[in-house]
Structures are given as C-alpha cells and as structure tokens.
C-alpha cells in the first residue's frame, strides 16, 4: 500500500512537460501502426499470379519477374509469387549429385563380355607332358596366363546398373535444382511461349539480348499446347529444346544453362512437388497407388 502511495505522489509531482513511460510506449505503437509513405514510390508492377498453395507461417512467397517472348524490350511484364518450399529450399548439392548420377545409371546396361578358358576355342590337349621336360607344368594353352587364353574375372555382360532412389530424394533433387537455377538468375518465367515469328535467328538474338547463354530449355504445360512458332523455331537449333512439364528432370536442367518456365508450368510443378511432402504411405498393393495424387 505504501508503495502505491509513493508512486502516486511521484506522478503528481512530475513536471507538466515530462511524459511517462506508458505515454511514450503508446506513441511508439501508434507510429509503428501508421508507416510514413515513401516519397519516391513509383507505380508497382502487377502481380500476375498469386501463390495459391498454403505457405508456412515462418516463410514468405518468393517473387520473380514475368517476362514475354514477343519482343526484345518486353522483358518484364509483371510479377509472380513462387512457393518457398519449391523455389527457395536448402541448396543440398549432395542430393543434386545423387539424383544426377542415378538418372545416368538406372537405365544403363553394359554389354561387355569376355570369354573364359572354357569358351575359348582350342586348348583341349595338354601342351607337353607333366614331368621330364624341365618346363613349367600346364594343362591347356587357353589358360588365363597364356597369350590367347581366356580371361579370369572379366565382365560377363549384359550387366544392369539399375537401382531406384527413394521418391523423397528424387523430389528433393528437383526442388534443389529449381532453387539453384533461381538463385543463379538462370530461371526465367514467361507468360507464354508465343513468338512473333518462326525464324530461329529471332530466338537466338533474343537469348543473346537477354544473356541467357548458349543453351536454353523451354518448359510448357503440355506438348500439344505448345505454340507452333516456338516449335518451328527450336526445331533447327540443337541447344534450344522444348520439354513438357511432366518430363522435367534434374539432368535436363543441369545440361542447359537457362531454364524458361511458363506460368501454368510453375503452378503444375508446385502442386506435384508439394504433394509429396504430405503424402501417406499406401496400405494397399502398389498396383493402386495414391488415389489422392493431384
């Protein structure tokens, strides 16, 4: 009780111009709620696509520019939001290496084959007698230590190098590849793959003007929906390739210097890749897997 009386007396004796700590705190909160407008704030670019899938509370969507292929100067036509769990993951280069090596080897079959001493023609007769000649004993001229003989412990093809990585590792490899491409400014998003002409020279000059490098991979949602102009323009170029979104892989992304995605492709990749983060283990045979697959 005495402490309350003393505090009230101090507040009553405080000069009129002094403000208490509570008043300063209230003013600070009010100033934080009303930010000052920027003096040089220009017109904001339109956001052409919002991130529709839920984003974790501790993360924010990544914004990227949307470009157009219809002209040299139409480099930025708006913004798009990218999901951080797909385009801003941890750069696990070890997983990227595992997926790249697996993709090269899981279809590999080695047909190398050598003949053993039983398969080489000849050598059925003993070259000389066992004793008395002074030379080393031999039973066949097709022994592995003879010239023209069989091979010991040689390859016996065809040999399959097939093995399967877990699905989680393969999905993470795609996420890491997309993240690295975006971080290195080698990932570009366009509104569509429409070109004003079918001339391959226009596509090469456009890539040179925007500094895309010598090899570019264009990804659209479906192969049937790709514009005819870009199909005709890339048909005569070896380093400019088209691929549907369902066929996008780590090897193709690492092989090309620049990756170009359309807006529907971005939505498709986010939906497919994020589904694996919350998928359940099937309790029924694998012939009917994952009925909730998007």
From Swiss-Prot:
One of its GO terms (cellular component) is mitochondrial large ribosomal subunit. Its main location: mitochondrion. Keywords: Methylation, Mitochondrion, Ribonucleoprotein, Ribosomal protein. GO terms for molecular function: structural constituent of ribosome. The modification Omega-N-methylarginine is found at residue 147. It comes from the Eukaryota. It is found in: Mitochondrion. InterPro entries: Ribosomal_uL4, Ribosomal_uL4-like, Ribosomal_uL4_dom_sf. Belongs to the universal ribosomal protein uL4 family. NCBIfam families: rplD_bact. This is Large ribosomal subunit protein uL4m. It comes from Bos taurus (Bovine).
